[in-house]
Amino acid sequence: MSKLVLILNCGSSSLKFAILDPATGEEKLSGLAEAFFLPEARIKWKLNGEKGNADLGAGAAHTEALNFIASNILNDELKNSIAAIGHRIVHGGEKYTQSVIVTDEVVKGIEDAAQFAPLHNPAHLIGIREAFKAFPHLKDKNVVVFDTAFHQTMPEEAFLYALPYSLYKEHGVRRYGAHGTSHYFVSREVAKYVGKPADQVNAIICHLGNGGSVSVVRNGQCIDTSMGLTPLEGLVMGTRCGDIDPAIVFYLYKTLGMSMDQIEETLVKKSGLLGLTEVTSDCRYAEDNYDDESKPETRRALNVYSYRLAKYIGAYMAVLGDDHLDAIAFTGGIGENSAHVRELALNHLKLFGIKIDNERNLATRFGKDGVITTDDSAFKAIVLPTNEELVIAQDTAKLCF
């Protein structure tokens, strides 16, 4: 068996894992351990096409999950084929512009960036430390891949806020973006699709899932993206508000008497599609009931969502200027599967000569890729499934094999 990479994506109460062959992209194992610290802590997986699940025990967390993977799921052949471990890291700050092997200095850098990703980075560090324990022979073969790295090519005019400059110089307050691993992968897929070298492609990439972001790529490099200091800025998302007037925070605090913790929970966990529908963060609910007059919240939510998305796409078309836009790409759970969202957003962009092909759009869902615009459309719109795990596996292999 060829050299394989174990990929870990640690959250505060869950752990996603996979084993990939970086040379072929073949997935040997995928799974999710969840409900950490609760009585119902559990794990489920798919190994060579066969599904399995198990209880981890009341209160189990990252340690128990990784030990279960190593001891109960992996057979000796697969375990011996794991040559390195790749970790997804949400925030690397300004320091990290590419993937690196884990060292004490790198761990310190992830800790320093945790102030901008307080829910994610501490959990990633737990994953790294537990991986050291579960796979001690691979301690010097752990690699971290940063979601912020691809966006580090943004120019100053794109990443700076119009705040006192000292906040940036002394405290790192600037725009960092997120979903960079996905944006990087899809930008390379766009290049293949249009027959151009990766370092010559110009694209607008819409990564739409429960979280969502748009990036604009010129000559293969990101020059702007919708998320900011944190993943709260930008698009309407499942539970996140995206762009708002910052003074709303003052109003909620001073006039409505909400605490800062309550405000944070409102903006991060109670807004977006959930806030607009007052029912659910699931985009499919709004889609399925869009024409139901008894549920006006669904039309309201989807219209706001797609309007905000169209504004970002249009703005980024302007940012490209004289550079020819090769394609607008849709990816992520919503981007790949919601023909309705794509249609609503692109219909706002008729001024640019974009023409959506309804038949192609409806046919391009559920893992299918393809062009969804007409042959005479001024610009192509393409649906391209993302593969962040493959990027992590390949980056890890480059550094370790």
From Swiss-Prot:
Organism lineage: Bacteria, Pseudomonadati, Pseudomonadota, Gammaproteobacteria, Pasteurellales
Chain positions recorded as substrate binding sites: R88
Descriptive protein name: Acetate kinase
Superkingdom field: Bacteria
Similarity remark: Belongs to the acetokinase family.
NCBIfam families in UniProt: ackA
EC number(s) from the headed UniProt entry: 2.7.2.1
Organism this protein belongs to: Haemophilus influenzae (strain ATCC 51907 / DSM 11121 / KW20 / Rd)
Feature type site, description Transition state stabilizer: H179, R240
GO BP: acetate metabolic process; acetyl-CoA biosynthetic process
Residues annotated to bind ATP: K16, H207, L208, G209, N210, G211, D282, C283, R284, G333, I334, G335, E336, N337
Co-factor requirement: Mg(2+); Mn(2+)
InterPro entries xrefs: Ac/propionate_kinase (IPR004372), Aliphatic_acid_kin_short-chain (IPR000890), Aliphatic_acid_kinase_CS (IPR023865), ATPase_NBD (IPR043129)
Catalyzed chemical reaction(s): acetate + ATP = acetyl phosphate + ADP
Keyword Chloroplast found: no
